[in-house]
Amino acid sequence: MWSGQPQQDEGLPVGLSAIPVPWKNLGPSKSNRESSGGLVEASTSWEEAQGEEHPAPAPLDVSRLRSSSMEIREKGSEFLKEELYKAQKELKLKDEECERLCKVRAQLEQELEELTASLFEEAHKMVREANMKQATSEKQLKEAWGKIDMLQAEVTALKTLVITSTPASPNRELHPQLLSPTKAGPRKGHSRQKSTSSSLCPVVCPTAGHIPTPDKEGKEVDTTLFAEFQAWRASPTLDKSCPFLERVYREDVGPCLDFTVQELSALVRTAVEDNTLTIEPVASQTLPAVKVPTVECNNTNTCALSGLARTCHHRIRLGDSDSHYYISPSSRARITAVCNFFTYIRYIQQGLVRQDAEPMFWEIMRLRKGMSLAKLGFFPQEA
């Protein structure tokens, strides 16, 4: 039963049912149209009421959003710049470290190269010095052997000279010191001498082949020669240009070594000056024949220097050559005289002679006398 209040429609929302709407009892079609129009109006009024009770949210602040975005972008840019700066700084440090290591490497390579070069140079220098010392030692050894051979030959010649110059029974008339005391002097009161030839023979008629030599010889120093010798002795040298040796070469050495075979004579002279000449005695067995540049020397009966037919008891060898040349006693005496002179002046040059100037001068004069006598053909007899 209707009580005069409109009832709430269960199919409508609460808001619309709560709104009081006047109802009119119209026809069926007209009432339906009026009811639908009323519903639309009620819905519109409900929305307005809802709008008044709950207002719509305000629009977003665009400028604020833009500022936040800009701030974020700037912070990101600054962060990236810092990272880029750090990376560039690290890269620069690494480049500097690489450059420093490259310099160290180049310096080490240069030092290693210099050290290697210095080591090779030092090793080459040591090898060169060792070779020079070895060559010098070998040369000195050869010279020593040459001197030994020469001295042995001289000793042999001196022994031969002593043996041949000492008779088995000495002549007591020529050596008064060998006489007995009763016969040493003349008897008292004896005024006559026998005129027989036998008593005068020791003085007037010396034995054949023996020339008596005086017991004493007069000596006088030539001032020119002595001055030249003193000048040479102040600084001994083997240079032929100095006045002292130039005179000896011109007056003694040159003539003494001037043999018939000129080519071999020049070789002998060079070997004597270089101290490379060797004189060897000829063995009893047959020796191989040796040819001389200008004179054939097929046996020991021809002198290679003079070309004369002489019995050769010695032979010479020049330097390291294997060739031997047979020489006569006269040629050997001439070569030996020159070798004795050169040996003595070498001893003076080396400081081995400890004498005053005058004894040394007279020894040189004696050696020059030996060269002159050998050139003139005087030489000791061989055994």
UniProtKB/Swiss-Prot annotation:
GO BP of this protein: muscle cell differentiation; protein transport
Please tell me whether the keyword Transport is annotated for this protein: yes
Q: Where is this region: Disordered?
A: 1-64, 167-200
What GO terms are given for molecular function? guanyl-nucleotide exchange factor activity
**A Pfam family per the record:** Sec2p
Please give the superkingdom of this protein's source: Eukaryota
**Record SUPFAM superfamilies:** Sec2 N-terminal region
Q: InterPro entries, per this entry?
A: RAB3IL/RAB3IP/Sec2 (IPR040351), Sec2_N (IPR009449)
Q: Does the keyword Protein transport apply?
A: yes
Q: Which residues form a coiled coil?
A: 77-128
Q: Which UniProt keywords apply?
A: Coiled coil, Guanine-nucleotide releasing factor, Phosphoprotein, Protein transport, Transport
Tell me where in this chain the PTM Phosphoserine is found. 169, 180
Question: What family, per the record?
Answer: Belongs to the SEC2 family.
Instruction: Give the protein's function.
Output: Guanine nucleotide exchange factor (GEF) which may activate RAB3A, a GTPase that regulates synaptic vesicle exocytosis. Promotes the exchange of GDP to GTP, converting inactive GDP-bound Rab proteins into their active GTP-bound form. May also activate RAB8A and RAB8B.
The record's note on quaternary structure and interaction partners says:
Interacts with RAB3A and IHPK1 through the coiled-coil domain. This interaction is competitive. IHPK1 kinase activity is not required for this interaction.
Q: State the name under which the record lists this protein.
A: Guanine nucleotide exchange factor for Rab-3A
**What is the native source organism of this protein?**
Mus musculus
